[in-house]
Every structure is written in C-alpha cells, then in structure tokens.
C-alpha cells in the first residue's frame, strides 16, 4: 500500500498557496483568521 502523502510542490501551492486562498471569499477568511492569531506563516 502506498503512502497517502506524495509531495508535489505545484499541487501544494495550487491547493494551499496564498493566491489560492486569496481567490475565494472563504480563503480570505482563513488568511484573516491566521493574521489575527498571529501566525508567522499564513499559507503554504
């Protein structure tokens, strides 16, 4: 059985990246939440 995590930089940024977050309203909410919490890294 193969492992579930198969790293792929392009897919990672497409799904969890900053521009992906900014492209939807809920994604912007995620970023706002993380800013409010004081996260050093906002997105992948």
UniProtKB/Swiss-Prot annotation:
It comes from the Bacteria. This is Large ribosomal subunit protein bL34. Keywords: Ribonucleoprotein, Ribosomal protein. Belongs to the bacterial ribosomal protein bL34 family. One of its GO terms (cellular component) is ribosome. Residues 1-44 are annotated as: Disordered. Residues 1-19, 26-44 have a biased composition (Basic residues). GO terms for molecular function: structural constituent of ribosome. InterPro entries: Ribosomal_bL34, Ribosomal_bL34_CS. The keyword Ribosomal protein applies. One of its GO terms (biological process) is translation.
């Amino acid at each position: 059985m193969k492992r579930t995590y198969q790293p792929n930089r392009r897919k990672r940024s497409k799904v969890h990246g900053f521009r992906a977050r900014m492209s939807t309203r809920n994604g912007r909410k995620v970023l706002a939440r993380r800013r409010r919490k004081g996260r050093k890294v906002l997105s992948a």
